Amino acid sequence: MENMAEEELLPQEKEEAQVRVPTPAPDSAPVPAPAADTALDSAPTPDSDPAPALAPAPAPALSPSLASVPEEAESKRHISIQRRLADLEKLAFGTEGDVDSASSLNSDNPGTENSQTCPLCPKEKFRAYSSHKLRRHLQNLHWKISVEFEGYRMCICHLACRPVKPTIVGEQISSKLGAHYHCIICSATITRRTDMLGHVKRHVNKGETKSRYIAASTAKSSNEILKETDTDIQVFPNYSIPQKTDSYFNPKMKLNRQIIFCTLAALAKERKPLECLDAFGATGIMGLQWAKHLGNAVKVTINDLNENSVTLIQKNCHLNKLKVVVDSEEKEEGDALEDDGTLGDIQVTRMDANVLMHLRSFDFIHLDPFGTSVNYLDSAFRNVRNLGIVSVTSTDISSLYAKAQHVARRHYGCNIVRTEYYKELAARIVVAAVARAAARCNKGIEVLFAVALEHFVLVVVRVLRGPTSADETAKKIQYLIHCQWCEERIFQKDGNMVEENPYRQLPCNCHGSMPGKTAIELGPLWSSSLFNTGFLKRMLFESIHHGLDDIQPLIKTLIFESECTPQSQCSTHAPSNTNKQEENGVFVKTTDDTTIDIYSAQGKRKSNEMAINLAKKQKTDASTAHPPFYYNIHRHSIKGMNMPKLKKFLCCLSQAGFRVSRTHFDPMGIRTDAPLMQFKSILLKYSTPTYTGAQSEGQMPPAAEDTVTDRVEMSVSDKAEASGCRRW
């Protein structure tokens, strides 16, 4: 049957909305056709039509918001957007006069295909043999289900004008066709009517109903230029959608890029030049920042497997006046770049990251794949140089943060549950995976720092060659016993003998007071320190030197966390034989560090001896390492009690003789070596009762006992002043 049933109009609701930007069309065309290099197909008439030049209807009076639309922008409006039903019928019948004239209504001859074809449907989808049937089709299947906005109707369109995905080389990928609407403001093509209503509503909320917005959209280029840390990059229009773009760029990862830059800047002070690799370049912004700000101190290699990303990286290099080296040959495009000492050469490669890391050796490797990075760890440690640095950014937070526990077991081979310290647990899982990969290559690691924020988990380690270092690293991977009632935790004791009652290792007595099994075994995890204080202080100095103000608060928090010292009690004294830079009460060492002698060592034999001495020194300094994990003060607050301020509680814990500091993992977390029982007792001691809540529930203790009421009467301010702490 040639005619289309009227009930088959509604679009498939499973199709997603796609947005396109119209491009200028020739002035002579009655219906605008976009340029060939855009991601937009035109709205053609049927193939058999001779496509005569139809005279447009007289322009109706525009609404107040669209009254100032210029004629050029008005001509670019899609044919499915009309003000009256008569205007839509004029497109179908092709008459300049009234569509109700006898000449148009009585043209029931099937041979006149131009007057019997719907302008919004392809010929193979609908053909009418009478003008009455065509008018009924336009009214019922296009006009009645349209979306109205300020006097205009956005009718449903069945033409092959859905956008296609463009590429840099000009290729186009076809997309699934279907019924859709054209937005009158931004020319977006959206499949569902409800989505179109919400789309227009968002335009109204943003105030994007003026004609200048239409003109700005048409003049918008295909690629956008962004700037971050004095580095310009060119990105695709859909750069923020990793599933739909060839080169993903996430502005929320700015903190990650800055802290990695500080890491490389601190490493560049040790030896020059450094062979650096950004294994997953995408837009190349990270490698561009290295080469632009560190100059000749680094030799940057940016790699990506996608051909379009490699082309974009090369464009971004020339945009920042950096020379591109492809296959060890300088690539010259256009005018010769000026010879500036601050500009460096960037080698751009296109190959699998595992292959590249097997072929070449580097001093600094950064891995930032889409998802987990465990598939690239073996290759990274295979050829990395001694005392080099490997940084790993993991964005599979659903598995690391215990939302997809089966994925964590599959990728990292560990058992994990959601705990109050889940972010540090995620960091220790990644470090354990890195340590196992290094040990398989007869290498050990020294963790410089580990950061776990909302969008990523970043781990930076230094590589120590030799089987001795590998064995020492492997011993630091242990299982964790976690109590599910009170959330007390402790690493299992070393040894291979099976313990009769593993619950005795926990400081709590929940197993004796609670029925059933109360604890679970998590891991394997990294059980040693997560921070190197000396390296973090050098990173802080580099951040101050390069003016990276956004990252300085995080690095300061990491320094206090590594020393497990409150910020108000941080040590301001340092040996006189070191060069120091003071910043907010913290002395930053610039030439002295625990491993600074190793960096200046020349020769493989001497550096290996220095690495062994470093391992021995780390073993003696194990007692001064920060305590593992932290407690959330809100998680352990007492019902019916007002807990003290966080800074005041830190002072109280320090007064009781415990090491204490805040943590970047949790804004309300406290890292301390106090057991949970002592933590709760001190929290109870300095909490004040909520009298209304306590009286209503009958929880007010008797006055004769030494309870919370008696403890509150103690002068907290006097004790704080006696210990040198200020009351907040």
From Swiss-Prot:
Compositional bias of kind Polar residues: 101-118
One GO cellular component term: nucleolus
Annotated Low complexity bias: 34-46
Region of interest called Disordered, as start-end residue ranges on this chain: 1-78, 98-118, 693-728
Tissue: Expressed in various neuronal structures during embryonic development, including spinal ganglia, trigeminal nerve and ganglion, olfactory and nasopharyngeal epithelium, nuclei of the metencephalon, thalamus and medulla oblongata. Also expressed in lung, esophagus, epiglottis, ependyma, vertebral column, spinal cord and brown adipose tissue. Expression persists in the adult brain with dynamically changing patterns in cortex and cerebellum.
InterPro entries reported in the protein's UniProt record: SAM-dependent_MTases_sf (IPR029063), Trm1 (IPR002905), tRNA_met_Trm1_C (IPR042296), Znf_C2H2_type (IPR013087)
Keyword Secreted: no
Gene field: Trmt1l
Protein name: tRNA (guanine(27)-N(2))-dimethyltransferase
Motif mapping: Nucleolar localization signal: 132-136
Phosphothreonine PTM sites in chain numbering: T23
